[in-house]
A protein has these predicted regions:
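Conserved beta-strand segments that form the floor/walls of ligand-binding pockets within enzyme
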Residues: 15, 67, 130
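Class I SAM-dependent transferase core
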Residues: 2-36
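Conserved Class I SAM-dependent methyltransferase catalytic core
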Residues: 15, 20, 32, 138-197
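A short helix-to-beta-strand connector/capping loop
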Residues: 10-11, 84-89, 180
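Conserved SAM/SAH cofactor-binding pocket of Class I
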Residues: 25-123
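Active-site-adjacent beta-strand anchor residues
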Residues: 66, 134, 161
Length: 202
């Protein structure tokens, strides 16, 4: 695999394949604000190049990193090895929670979701799948909100990144309807949207 790009974050270097989402403002927002503590089991959904999984592994007891993109899994494994985090991270290829075992529970679930409204053609490439959220930007978010709480430990947290273009209030409402407490933790203004970090507690 050829890695045409390098991304730097703090003391880490991440190689990014052409078929893998390149970390941007949304990735860095989650990287800076994620609340990993020692002895926690972490699920990194949509791991991409592995930046969040590697950073979470600094403190976490264990990390499970999932992506539907096989190129992303290969790239993330390489980055975990390069950054000395491979032993703590288990990588799984699959669609959202499908690779998660029914009896698995996590203290922290992290997801930089595909959140931008998109046309069907934009979802066909592997990179497109990382950002394209369907006609209203919620195609993947809605599935995640419905399924992820099933794997959240008692007292656990979810940190979800999405856009102001994909109905943040709907996300909060859906989590609250599942007897969770959701709120906007922070947001960053970029060109034509706000990137929003939603925090959820059980």
């Amino acid at each position: 695999m050829v890695y045409p790009k390098k991304v730097y974050f703090k003391d880490y270097v991440f190689m990014v394949d052409e078929h893998v989402y390149e970390p941007a403002e949304d990735s860095f927002l989650l990287a800076e604000k994620m609340t990993v503590t020692e002895d926690e089991a972490v699920l990194d959904m949509g791991t991409g190049c592995g930046i969040i999984a590697v950073l979470a592994a600094e403190k976490a007891k264990s990390v499970v990193a999932v992506d539907i993109n096989p190129y992303a899994i290969e790239c993330a494994i390489k980055n975990a090895e390069m950054n000395g985090a491979r032993e703590k991270i288990e990588f799984r290829h699959g669609d959202l929670v499908k690779p998660i075992k029914p009896n698995e529970h996590f203290n922290l679930i992290l997801f930089n979701a595909p959140y931008l409204p998109s046309e069907p053609d934009e979802e066909k490439s592997w990179v497109g799948k990382a950002w394209a959220g369907g006609s209203n930007g919620r195609k993947v978010i809605d599935r995640f909100v419905m399924d992820a709480p099933n794997f959240l430990a008692v007292g656990g947290r979810i940190q979800l990144v999405q856009s102001s273009l994909s109905d943040v209030n709907r996300t909060i409402q859906m989590f609250n309807e599942r007897n969770l407490r959701a709120m906007v933790a922070t947001q960053v203004k970029v060109a034509f949207e706000r990137i929003v970090l939603v925090e959820v507690k059980r």
